[in-house]
Amino acid sequence: MMLLQLSNVSVDTRLAPFSTQVAAGLQTHLIGPNGAGKSTLLASLAGLLPSGGDISLAGKALSLYSGPDLARLRAYLCQQQSALTMMPVFQYLSLYQPAGASLDAIATTIGYLCERLRLTDKLPRMLSQLSGGEWQRVRLAAVFLQVWPDINPDSKLLLLDEPYTGLDVAQKVALDSLLREFCSAGRSAIISAHDLNHTLQQADQVWLMSGGNVLAQGSTDKVMRANILSEVFEVDFQIHNFNRQNWIITKDF
């Protein structure tokens, strides 16, 4: 089932026309140098940035959804967002709870997400008192809450712009696990990323961008090749297999 379809999607001078489709249950990574257009593409897919061409989500044009209906289908984490000062974490999370879910189910899901992201003891804390990494995890918990399958059966898509920023190793592993759980429930996630080895291990498919163009797209093993990556990033890469797993390294490593 094709969950998301793009036909000649473009944004003025920032994003060249791009067409593709995304099946349910997949994790797609956007990679490319800074300024490649990854954030522009994600904001367009979220319906927050006007674009040319056509975007369809769950078989319906994105432009035809009302704000509340779109919020029920997809959640979007932007790259940067300032913390609201006079609000505790639990109140901030409540802003993202989907309509129609029971309070008990919402409380259970908040507890589950906060435990996984190690936020349980932060629930009463003011947002202004959080570190950068804590605030990032709160933002992640919020967008997961918005579309978590247990409390939002209509959810389809999670759009994350550099979600691993500010996370330590254990927190990155926790996020990986939540994303796999989300996608295994028939949803899809599209994520902008910078760690090429992480993309190599976690992504089902990859969109490789540079200068506002999607230069390569397809399965991870098709796109994550040394010659393709070297040309785009202007770094000499090679791929080595260690313990039956491929790793991307630079040639002068």
Swiss-Prot record:
Where in the cell? Answer: Cell inner membrane
Molecular function in Gene Ontology: ABC-type vitamin B12 transporter activity; ATP binding; ATP hydrolysis activity
Output the PROSITE patterns linked to this UniProt entry: ABC_TRANSPORTER_1, ABC_TRANSPORTER_2
Topology of the protein relative to the lipid bilayer: Peripheral membrane protein
Residue ranges the record marks as coiled coil = none
Reaction catalysed by this chain?
Answer: an R-cob(III)alamin(out) + ATP + H2O = an R-cob(III)alamin(in) + ADP + phosphate + H(+)
Q: Which Gene3D superfamilies match?
A: P-loop containing nucleotide triphosphate hydrolases (3.40.50.300)
The segment(s) forming the ABC transporter domain are: 4-236
Chief site of localization: membrane
Say which enzyme class the record assigns: translocase
Question: Which superkingdom, per the lineage?
Answer: Bacteria
Q: Which UniProt keywords apply?
A: ATP-binding, Cell inner membrane, Cell membrane, Membrane, Nucleotide-binding, Translocase, Transport
Matching entries from InterPro entries are given as: AAA+_ATPase, ABC_transporter-like_ATP-bd, ABC_transporter-like_CS, ABC_transptr_BtuD, Metal_Ion_Import_ABC, P-loop_NTPase
Known EC number(s)? 7.6.2.8
GO CC annotation terms, alphabetical: plasma membrane
Listed binding positions for ATP are 32-39
Q: HAMAP family in the record, alphabetically?
A: BtuD
Its function?
Part of the ABC transporter complex BtuCDF involved in vitamin B12 import. Responsible for energy coupling to the transport system.
The UniProt similarity line reads:
Belongs to the ABC transporter superfamily. Vitamin B12 importer (TC 3.A.1.13.1) family.
NCBIfam families membership: PRK03695.1 (NF002981)
Quaternary structure, from the entry: The complex is composed of two ATP-binding proteins (BtuD), two transmembrane proteins (BtuC) and a solute-binding protein (BtuF).
- Its recorded name reads Vitamin B12 import ATP-binding protein BtuD
Annotated source species: Yersinia enterocolitica serotype O:8 / biotype 1B (strain NCTC 13174 / 8081)
The coding gene here is btuD
